[in-house]
Amino acid sequence: MAVRRTSLFAGCCLLVLAGLAAEPQRRPVFLNYDDTHYAASRSKAGVVPTEDEVRGLVRQYRGTDVTDLLFCICGRIAGVTNGVKESWCDKYHQTAENGRQVSYTNHYLCVYREMEEELGLDRYALWIDEARRSGIRPWLSFRMNDCHCTYEPTSFLHPDFFHRHPECRRVRHRAASGYFDNCLDYSIAAVRERELKFIREMLARYDADGVEIDWLREVYCFAPGRESAAVMTAFMRSVRELADAAAKRRGHAVRVLVRVPADPETALRFGFDAAAWADEKLVDVLVPCPRWETTDNDLPTDLWKRLLRKTGVQLAPGLELRICDHPWKAPFYMLTNQIRGWAAAQYSLGADALYLYNYFDDPGWKNPKTTYWRSFDQPQGTKGVDWANQLKWLKEIGSPEQVAAGQRDHMLTYRDLVPLWDEVRRPFPARVEKGAPKFFRLATGRIPAGRTLRLRLGVKGGRPPSQVFVNSRPCRYLGNEECVPAFTSDPICVYEVPPYTEDAAVVEVLADAPAELSHLDLQVRQICRGTDPAKRLLLGGR
């Protein structure tokens, strides 16, 4: 009898282990929540803030792959009344600014004033508490050098510090002319101490699991030519000390996450020696990320992974909201298939986690008049950021297996942030000369067997290039189609791509006459049984 019981127990254990093995492995997903979005979206949707509604923001993410919520508590204005910076309440009551009469009482920020002064609702305390109840780690996020509206004489985003201390701006040797010239100069001790003092006060007030130091709002922290990695590393040591002191008081770890430019060289040229921060254990999570113009589908995640080797720092590449392949064209919102494609590529390149920026909720999403994410070029319900769509892909993005197996698109984009003396690389328009191959590279990650692959080229005039190869494998021309959404107005030439096992697609284009290309993407679709193969490929598996 004892032997039978032991065998039965062992059999049950094996079944449990088999079930665990079959369950897709989940990775952490960090989601940054903007400091103004709650007020802007609730005001637009006509939502009245109550404690339950405030907590409901966090409850929406239960059952998704979001493991960490990073609540922005300051850009240039603080989210709550404090002893260091002006708050939204201060701006609401302001009547004079920069020698001019102002009134911000009809602005959507009045929602925050009502919550704090009339209802007694501390949204950050409620969000932190509800996050823990929901099994989500709560963080406080700090934008270190935001510069929205700095060329306007008055703004609800201007602190008095900005007006009173022009000597603290990064460009003082000439008249300010560029968007970032009025950013603050971190070589000035008063600038650094002001930020550290605010972080210290917020960590004393709130029991957060971590702090995000967001250097991408903005990276322009020094006068041109005076970028100092030593100054920034010393600053990060101070942040680490504040986090460790908070951890000692709270009895749990308080981690440090930093958001930096997409590639290590650009980060260093701006003064951010992220590799040194990792070596010194000053940070726990590193987020290389584009600035804003477009998602970067060619993040050097594999290079960052090598730099962080043996440091224990978690690598979480960042996804932006928008996508574009021409710096001078209006961008589009990412599509769900493009989000899957980006995630699959990042996991294949070595990402430990993923980070989402500008992906917010939308309480008015059911009504076209109140929805926050409106676009005249993309119908409601077709964008990845549309709330109903978010709630679907947020349940799969934490699984490398799920995003790799699903329908996904990989579009060639560009890097939107480069050192001051460099120029943004523009992939299009791209000229293909007769008889001279033109090369492109798409990071795709491994593609499972049983998939159809469609390479799509935007070609001016619509004449298909005579030869196209992917990873030295010849591709078959299938026909032309319209680009929807209109990433390009040129006809799209579609090619069937043979299966490949590499992590990236190196595309080689040859033409028997000069050609101009305006778009490139690769669509990965599951094979639909019972459909003519050529028709299936031309329709993209839809």
Model segments located where?
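Active-site-adjacent "subsite" loops/lids of carbohydrate-active enzymes
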Residues: 26-51, 91, 95-129, 139-201, ...
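Acidic-and-aromatic substrate-binding clefts and catalytic sites of carbohydrate-active enzymes
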Residues: 39, 46-52, 74-79, 261-270, ...
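Catalytic domains of carbohydrate-active enzymes, especially glycoside hydrolases
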Residues: 52-79, 83, 205-210, 282-286, ...
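Aromatic-lined carbohydrate-binding/catalytic grooves of carbohydrate-active enzymes
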Residues: 66-117, 221-222, 287-292, 302
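Substrate-binding cleft of secreted/luminal carbohydrate-active enzymes
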Residues: 66-77, 285-295, 331-411
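Beta-strand-rich ligand-recognition modules
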Residues: 459-541
